Amino acid sequence: MAAAMVAAVHGVGRQDRSSPGGGGAPQVDTGKYVRYTPEQVEALERVYGECPKPSSLRRQQLIRECPILSNIEPKQIKVWFQNRRCREKQRKEASRLQTVNRKLTAMNKLLMEENDRLQKQVSRLVYENGYMRQQLHNPSVATTDTSCESVVTSGQHHQQQNPAATRPQRDANNPAGLLAIAEETLAEFLSKATGTAVDWVQMVGMKPGPDSIGIIAVSHNCSGVAARACGLVSLEPTKVAEILKDRPSWYRDCRCVDVLHVIPTGNGGTIELIYMQTYAPTTLAAPRDFWILRYTSGLEDGSLVICERSLTQSTGGPSGPNTPNFVRAEVLPSGYLIRPCEGGGSMIHIVDHVDLDAWSVPEVLRPLYESPKILAQKMTIAALRHIRQIAHESSGEMPYGGGRQPAVLRTFSQRLSRGFNDAVNGFPDDGWSLMSSDGAEDVTIAFNSSPNKLVGSHVNSSQLFSAIGGGILCAKASMLLQNVPPALLVRFLREHRSEWADPGVDAYSAAALRASPYAVPGLRAGGFMGSQVILPLAHTLEHEEFLEVIRLEGHSLCHDEVVLSRDMYLLQLCSGVDENAAGACAQLVFAPIDESFADDAPLLPSGFRVIPLDGKTDAPSATRTLDLASTLEVGSGGTTRASSDTSSTCNTRSVLTIAFQFSYENHLRESVAAMARQYVRTVVASVQRVAMAIAPSRLGGQIETKNPPGSPEAHTLARWIGRSYRFHTGADLLRTDSQSMDSSLKAMWQHSDSIMCCSLKAAPVFTFANQAGLDMLETTLIALQDISLEKILDDDGRKALCTEFPKIMQQGFAYLPGGVCVSSMGRPVSYEQAVAWKVLSDDDTPHCLAFMFVNWSFV
């Protein structure tokens, strides 16, 4: 009876109650409730595990197959499953709420600690301010001061003095001396992570919360550059430490980490002597290397600490390896403080503080090495994001892409990024050698006759390099860009591959993966390239990076190009396309793959990398889509806001690095080199044209440079469009309470239907579109002017327009039947109806034609 009472908990429902029956079967009475025995509950639970929501036929089958359920009505079985699903949902919701509550509790603790740290910083700044006031009010002290310290020296300045100046001499070439350095490093790191040793300024846009990445801050007025992060993850401290120590897995600029010595300490910690190499981000600077002491230890409160610093002449200690062509940089006391959270998970404090020897690079590139925001994006935020990604994958809630586990897809991303870095840097110890130049130094050509050493033993490279001998050739170049947001440029290159890519070169790269021989192509304009289809594979938790497969549909032009008629596939990695991420590097890397897409497939990555050279202002930048006052206005009609936005963006600079890799057979090396050199020059020219088109699009006062003579300002055009529509049709197009020109422009821009204008010429081209129109055409305001009306309409649409065109010119408007058009990416778009009308200027002369596609959607 006791067992039956326990089992009743599983059976209580809206319509069943237990009654104490014997014989193991429930006794259904005239009431509404039934009591289930343990055997019956076990049978029901077994079916629930297989199918939580069985159909009526399945429930009847269950009663027939289980004699112990034969005396229960099918309706009661249905109620049991309903209640069971309800209890499961409640359990999951309760668990989720408990998790959120733990996160909020931990975040509250983190914010309180951050508030205490900021209070200390405020107190110190108040003290220093008073000290400065005292010095300014006592000029006589300044004139009579003969000490070596300046009168403006503050407490902060004293803190930033090199501690080596007061450190007593010691022998750091033994374990005791190294432990002393390690303990000093630990103390200095903790003072940065939780104290006020560095003035931290929070990065814009990084808001704390239960689902946010955490609190991100960068240094202000300190030696070197530093970044700091605090966040919560649902992994235990030991697992977090293991991930952070595996730096190449999350720091994309890390080439190698060699642990040369491991020394256990008496307190249970370890000291490691590490040599690390990092890639150069561009072809215009040398890579960096580091000689580091890393100290891992536990604190009394149960926290785990991993701290590190460079061993230099001032710190003492053994000398590290010296590698030619690398510039020795310095890690100042940095590390990770990992604290366990109540209920599971960890609270992480990350500090990265480095001196990258910026004076050794050309002056124009120094911002790459002097920007704490770039350091934060590349190292600090990258580490925290990687840990959060692993935690999310470990939870089992992340769907697999293409049938592959997240770890496999992550390996593909790492291989693409690493292969591109290898191509940009071209290290001699990987087998790279420079080819003689043709006299112009704009494109560098390097070749690698030992590709198996570069590709790696774990990759099947037999299909990539023929038995008669061959290798890899890389053509690369770097250039400076002005006024081009990196994210916007990379996004355009991704979405409009046909604007810069040569289909013959793509086919050559794809043919290298096949057994058939191939010839070196001649460059051609346009070519056979069909549509581009993007197949998503995976993305990171915050969508700052995504992996995808690109299918290029090929259409051969003649019989001798049969090899080109096959579809081609690219594995592509895109990152940094968020325009609001300060200091973020935007990158587009791709490699040809075959249809099998094996895990060990060889990859020859090529692509683009754009890095900002100037830090962004703290004010959020205007987006291209809806800062109408700055994006769409023209000439002197720009508002004050447009002027201020222009001043904040008109001087931005970035460095673009391009690298393309090709496999070659030995007897074709010179031909491939000539093709690669010319191809990269062609790509550079294409990117420059795109950059020139994109650059003014964000500068409100300069947008007149792309408009034809006589073009009206955007708000005037919006007024003409709305007024002409009302004049011809008698209906209002723009519903706005205000009569101001700005409100009309905003209403048209936000209109749900696609509205676009085209010129009154023999071959009409689009001159303007609202946001819905740009979305439908899958283009931008700049690229819009390269799209003709005839290009987007199908045969039926063109016939309908030709039939109604005289009516449009005579009566001013016409309704066109619904149909299908195509976007600039080749995707079909259906619409219920189209309206065409003549747009009249203030003097009633025809200015352009306007079209509105009603209720459009992608097919």
Curated annotation (Swiss-Prot):
GO terms for cellular component: nucleus. InterPro entries: HD, HD-Zip_III, Homeodomain-like_sf, MEKHLA, START-like_dom_sf, START_lipid-bd_dom. Keywords: Coiled coil, DNA-binding, Homeobox, Nucleus, Transcription, Transcription regulation. Residues 100-129 form a coiled coil. GO terms for molecular function: DNA binding; DNA-binding transcription factor activity; lipid binding. Expressed in seedlings, roots, stems, leaf sheaths and blades and panicles. Residues 29-92 bind DNA. Its main location: nucleus. It is found in: Nucleus. Residues 171-393 form the START domain. Residues 7-31, 146-172 are annotated as: Disordered. Gene3D superfamilies: 3.30.530.20, Homeodomain-like. Probable transcription factor. Belongs to the HD-ZIP homeobox family. Class III subfamily. This is Homeobox-leucine zipper protein HOX32. It comes from Oryza sativa subsp. indica.
